[in-house]
């Protein structure tokens, strides 16, 4: 397979999914025929329209990846696509909140970090040095 064909496939993948990861480039460069079969599987189970719409599938991706403690940047990619597909920042946050018990606080934290970074949420500065820092204990 040519480099040109691999590049075209990766551009098409990015257009359909809304993102590409480093692993996609490696897979396509190493074995484009297999990567295309994998892409067909992803289309059938994830990006293709069936009963669940893409927004719902992205919410599921976000909470599952948070539960599995995926890399924050990977979770952010799905937060970004969910927003593009019409999810509100509050819906994404609620999806993460709804599964905190079964997935645990550590996984929730990773999902929350991805959500805050992608939605430009400005958290309270907990260092005690910034303008949004909480007041010292006893001075509320």
What annotation goes with each model-predicted range?
Residues 95-99, 130-133:
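Short linear loop/turn motifs
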Residues 33-40, 69-75, 103:
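Short acidic alpha-helix initiation/capping motifs at coil-to-helix transition points
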Residues 66-68, 136:
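A generic structural signal for short
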Residues 68-93:
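Mid-chain, well-packed structural core segment of small domains
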Residues 57-65, 96:
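Short, structured motif recognition centered on aromatic/hydrophobic residues
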Residues 98, 103-106:
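Substrate/cofactor-recognition hotspot
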Residues 80, 97, 113-116:
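A broadly conserved amphipathic alpha-helix scaffold signal in soluble, globular proteins
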Residues 1-56, 108-140:
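Acidic, glycine/proline-rich low-complexity segments that act as flexible tails and inter-domain linkers
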């Amino acid at each position: 397979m040519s480099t040109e064909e691999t590049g075209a496939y990766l551009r098409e993948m990015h257009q359909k999914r809304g993102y590409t990861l480093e692993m996609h480039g490696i897979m396509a460069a190493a074995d484009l025929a297999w990567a295309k079969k994998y892409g067909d599987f992803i289309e059938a189970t994830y990006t293709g329209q069936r009963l669940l719409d893409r927004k719902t599938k992205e919410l599921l991706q976000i909470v599952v990846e948070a539960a599995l403690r995926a890399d924050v940047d990977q979770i952010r990619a799905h937060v970004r696509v969910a927003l593009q597909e019409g999810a509100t920042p509050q819906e994404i946050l609620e999806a993460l909140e709804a599964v905190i018990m079964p997935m645990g606080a550590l996984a929730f934290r990773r999902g929350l970090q991805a959500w805050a970074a992608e939605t430009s949420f400005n958290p309270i500065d907990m260092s005690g040095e910034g303008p949004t820092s909480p007041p010292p204990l006893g001075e509320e």
